[in-house]
């Protein structure tokens, strides 16, 4: 048992999916997993363990943003020995050729968060995904015929920005999309020597205003979960 997770030792699998929304964690468990048990309800941040294609997998809600996901990733690794962590969530496209419903696999994540500046004063640490997980997720997506993009994303500390100038400039440097957690996940995975990946679906485009319908969002979300689960069980 840790501060924010009430699971007993052995109740959490070595491979875990990390949606921000705890209700998405519940949906994933009920829709994709078998023999499901709920191991956490502290602060309503639901966590479940079950099996997928005969392999043990867990799903844990993390909340939104760098501080929240950092809490859960730290505890999952340090207290429960989790080895493979895959964030599953949505993002907003920045590049013109990135379309809604595309799947983005984050190779790395730049950020406006000060998280790493606290650890590396005066330096910019560049956290990266685990290549084995990335390759497995990419292969799983392309085998399903999905449009999968791999590249850099922006992990932002602010959802409602007063100006999009910096986001536009990052787009000029090839950043694909913006979200709010990947930098923290990849940094902590590097710190503790475990494997991490972010698999994201594009729910809207920051500059064109295009966005998915609720039905499209659910279909794409399901496809993303299958990609993440297929990668997780191969580790």
Curated annotation (Swiss-Prot):
It is an enzyme of class 2 (transferase). Homohexamer; trimer of homodimers. The active site is at residue 204. HAMAP family: Pur_nucleosid_phosp (MF_01627). Catalyzes the reversible phosphorolytic breakdown of the N-glycosidic bond in the beta-(deoxy)ribonucleoside molecules, with the formation of the corresponding free purine bases and pentose-1-phosphate. It catalyses: a purine D-ribonucleoside + phosphate = a purine nucleobase + alpha-D-ribose 1-phosphate; a purine 2'-deoxy-D-ribonucleoside + phosphate = a purine nucleobase + 2-deoxy-alpha-D-ribose 1-phosphate. The lineage of its organism: Bacteria, Bacillati, Bacillota, Bacilli, Bacillales. GO terms for biological process: purine nucleoside catabolic process. The keyword Glycosyltransferase applies. PROSITE patterns: PNP_UDP_1. The keyword Glycosyltransferase applies. A purine D-ribonucleoside binds at residues 4, 162, 179-181, 203-204. GO terms for molecular function: purine-nucleoside phosphorylase activity. This is Purine nucleoside phosphorylase DeoD-type. It comes from Bacillus cereus. Belongs to the PNP/UDP phosphorylase family. Keywords: Glycosyltransferase, Transferase. Its EC number is 2.4.2.1. SUPFAM superfamilies: Purine and uridine phosphorylases (SSF53167). It holds the Pfam family PNP_UDP_1.
């Amino acid at each position: 048992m840790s501060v924010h997770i009430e699971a007993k030792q052995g109740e959490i699998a070595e491979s875990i999916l990390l949606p921000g929304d705890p209700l998405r964690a519940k949906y994933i468990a009920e829709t994709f997993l078998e023999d499901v048990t709920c191991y956490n309800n502290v602060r309503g941040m639901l966590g479940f363990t079950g099996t997928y294609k005969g392999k043990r997998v867990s799903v844990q809600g993390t909340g939104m943003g760098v501080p929240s996901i950092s809490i859960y990733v730290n505890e999952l690794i340090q207290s429960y020995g989790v080895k493979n962590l895959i964030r599953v969530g949505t993002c907003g496209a920045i590049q013109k050729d990135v379309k809604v419903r595309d799947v983005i696999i984050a190779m790395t994540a730049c950020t406006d968060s000060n998280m790493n500046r606290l650890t590396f004063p005066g330096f910019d640490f560049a956290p990266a995904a685990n290549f084995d997980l990335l390759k497995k997720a990419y292969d799983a997506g392309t085998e399903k015929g999905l449009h999968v993009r791999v590249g850099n994303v922006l992990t932002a500390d602010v959802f409602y920005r007063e100006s999009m100038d910096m986001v536009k400039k990052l787009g000029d440097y090839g950043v694909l999309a913006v979200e709010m957690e990947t930098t923290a996940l990849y940094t902590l995975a590097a710190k503790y020597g475990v494997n991490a990946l972010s698999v994201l679906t594009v729910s809207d485009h920051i500059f064109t205003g295009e966005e998915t319908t609720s039905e499209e969002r659910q279909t794409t979300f399901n496809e993303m979960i299958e990609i993440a689960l297929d990668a997780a069980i191969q580790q």
